[in-house]
Amino acid sequence: MDICRLCLRGVSGAQMCLQIFDVDSGESKVAEVLRQHFWFEVLPNDEISKVICNVCWTQVSEFHQFYVSIQEAQVIYATTSKFKQDPEMVNTSWPEEVLMPADVLAVDNDVGAQINVNPLDELDLSQPMSPEDSKVGIKTERQSPDMELLFEDANNEQDEDYEDDEDDDTDDLIVTRSGRKRKRDVAKPAKTKRGTVSVGRKGKEKMVVKRGPPKRIFKMERLPPFCKEDEELIKRYIVMGCELCIFLAEDFDGIREHFKDKHPDERPYIKCCGRKLNKRCLIQEHARRHENPEYIKCKDCGKVFANSSVLRAHWLVHHVPDEECDFQCEDCGKRFSRRNLLELHKGSHVPVNERKFICPQCPKHNAFATEYHMQVHISMQHRKAANICHVCGKKIKDKAVFEKHVRLHFEESGPRIKCPRPDCESWLKDEDNLKQHLRRHNDEGKLFICSECGKSCKNSRALIGHKRYSHSNVIYTCEQCGKTFKKDISLKEHMAQHTGEPLYKCPFCPRTFNSNANMHSHKKKMHPVEWDIWRKTKTGSSQKVLPSAQVAQMFRDDADVAAIANDYSG
């Protein structure tokens, strides 16, 4: 399993990672960004790791873009010409305009805007900017890690941090980074795309941005310091033990001291539920999830996540309103909240026959629009070995799904759950299947139209299946007769006709089948009562997939029976 070079966490199957260095040239823009902002250097032959997880890279990329925008603003300020103040505009009030603090101001390259700050607070401009760094200007939000999740108005937060002096009705105060307060210069504004540039008393320009409608931001409220309740909660659910040796500590401070003494080359951590926890706040968050499994839950869709970082990434992708998404696709008009999400989406518009990046590990030779898309595919599909069920031989990559699958072979699942909708007669295996089933009903009434043929589908999953089956160029060819199929399972069932080995067995009688559809038809026709009872009450699977060893044993048993019959007949 790969680990992220920054957070040193294992990269799970559901989490994407990015190669820091190019495989061929050994060069990387990612490494340059990391070298600029971190105290350690990542080398092409790094012994720890050569990949960075998508969560870490998203945060680093956003900060780097913010850093570049501030650097550009300071360069503009240092090179601006001097203007004179218009005395008629000194006492003019602007009720709908607010001078934004520098740490939340976004500067675009095409806007000639200057920020009015104290020269003593200027950044060090001795470092040259790379051409790539000067291309991006993006808004950022501050994130406080490991907190309770809630949504608040971004402007409320700004009003608390930057309060106006109530005793002064005419002059506004600006708080500089050094903590000093000074009056704001007001002058005749000049219109720009993003706002208004006002000329101050000393001829310096400053950016005045009109406050738009309040935006919902993903905010995490800071939790109080560790208390006895948190310590008791952690002791109740988490064992403070060293995974590298036999050692138990009272708390995480004891683990830190132990690692410092016995494992100085390792970063202190504990392990619980298969996850490495290397910070006290992560341990606290994990303990709260033991106490309340829905502690980290999306308030928009109800989906539950393992940690707050993944929840934040989910919210940015799925729940940011379109009017608050600043990056729009030129081909389809879809909007995104982050530039990297837009770049990831653009690959979907590249025709399949023009995709030049071929996965070297795929037997299907899947093609991708960019190298980044291919690396994401490799990270999710090929870097983690699939789990193979020792009972039926099924391959399952997700660990939780695999463990649930194995348990069903030896344990009886709960009773079937009926869909709560009055117009649906479906019975589902468990709560997870019910949640997935309810998404197919499309209560919102959205239209899912195929862009290729105009067919209307009930939900997004049906649309994806339609495109994959009807408009995909991927085919599966039988090596013995040359017949082609659209689905992998269709080829597998076809090959059973060549080999003579059955794939399925009826759960109600000894009959076997090569096709799942034939077995399903057999159950409804020959066992209607058993089938109806199973749909509503019976536990377990509605079919039996035969492993190859069991099939071979069946053929040996048939051969033995035939031999005995021949002996008696002779």
Curated annotation (Swiss-Prot):
* Biological process (GO), any one: female meiotic nuclear division
Q: Where is this motif: Bipartite nuclear localization signal 2?
A: 523-539
Please list the residue ranges that the record marks as compositionally biased, kind Basic residues: 178-194
Q: What is this protein called?
A: Transcription factor grauzone
Domains: what does the record tell us?
The N-terminal zf-AD is an atypical treble-clef like zinc binding domain which enables dimerization, and appears not to have any DNA-binding ability. DNA binding is achieved through the zinc fingers at the C-terminus.
Pfam families per record: zf-AD, zf-C2H2, zf-C2H2_4
The organism's place on the tree of life at top rank? Eukaryota
Keyword set, alphabetical order: Activator, DNA-binding, Meiosis, Metal-binding, Nucleus, Repeat, Transcription, Transcription regulation, Zinc, Zinc-finger
Identify the GO cellular component terms for this protein: nucleus
The biased composition feature labelled Acidic residues covers: 149-172
Summarizing the annotation, the consequence of altering residue 493 to K is: In QE70; defects in female meiosis. Abolishes DNA-binding activity
Q: Where does Zn(2+) bind?
A: 4, 7, 53, 56
